[in-house]
Amino acid sequence: MKVISSIQELRDQLRGQNRTAFVPTMGNLHEGHLSLMRLARQHGDPVVASIFVNRLQFGPNEDFDKYPRTLQDDIEKLQQNNVYVLFAPTERDMYPEPQEYRVLPPDDLGGILEGEFRPGFFAGVCTVVTKLMSCVQPRVAVFGKKDYQQLMIVRRMCQQLALPVEIIAAETVRDEDGLALSSRNRYLTTDERKEAPELAKTLQRVRDSVLGGERDLGKLEQHAHTHLAERGWVPDYIAIRRRANLIAPSAAELEAGEPLVVLAAAKLGATRLIDNLEI
């Protein structure tokens, strides 16, 4: 596996490749990330991964400086998963001058849910993903369903900007107790780690209620919010939305069997966790 930091060297290395599969990450790789690499292998060749902790998608009070950086361990894991090139640029490589041009998602998708609680987050994501796509020029790119809103925004961005890349969605990988794998799970204390699977269990109960015929979605959302709060969580949102556009479904859409997803974000101690389940 080649480890490359220069954009020009990356382009030289990939010149002539027309089936490249790309997996962008921020590093601190776990089994969830590695499952994306294996899925990418099924859809293209060679597989290119990137590791770049993107300052643009961190808010002023978020964890950019303490975000775990484990490049040498990550390199070993990628080598074991047959990745052809790791693109690991420095901040100077990616942003040699201030990034004045940004890619902004529409407010009706980028300003809700995660976007409401993390202003500017999706502008940072869209900007860096567009720049990475320009560098790698993949035929397919793999994103995880765990970041459901991000997946939807990136897919729509590629469609509307006519970027010649197919976005592949990867299922969320979970620990044995149901907790979705995340680089931020390492921030949890021992007691918090024991409590953390309750987020997924709460979403499962919401899902089961909807599938069981409950149509008062607001009541389900409020009950879930209250349940987590009583256990010491600080929920940002629990929302049942249409999968197609993350808008709340109408009564008619519910009766017609509109595909739904329940999404949640909540703090447990100092750690903010997100999760979702399709319904």
From Swiss-Prot:
Q: Name one GO cellular component term.
A: cytosol
Alphabetical keyword list: ATP-binding, Cytoplasm, Ligase, Nucleotide-binding, Pantothenate biosynthesis
Broad enzyme group: ligase
State the signal peptide span.
Answer: none
- Which SUPFAM superfamilies would you find in this protein's record? Nucleotidylyl transferase (SSF52374)
Active-site residues per Swiss-Prot or TrEMBL entry:
33 (proton donor)
> Key word NADP present in the record?
no
In the Enzyme Commission scheme, what number(s) does this protein have? 6.3.2.1
Q: What is the designated name of this protein?
A: Pantothenate synthetase
Species source reads: Burkholderia cenocepacia (strain HI2424)
Which lineage do the record's taxonomy fields give for this organism? Bacteria, Pseudomonadati, Pseudomonadota, Betaproteobacteria, Burkholderiales
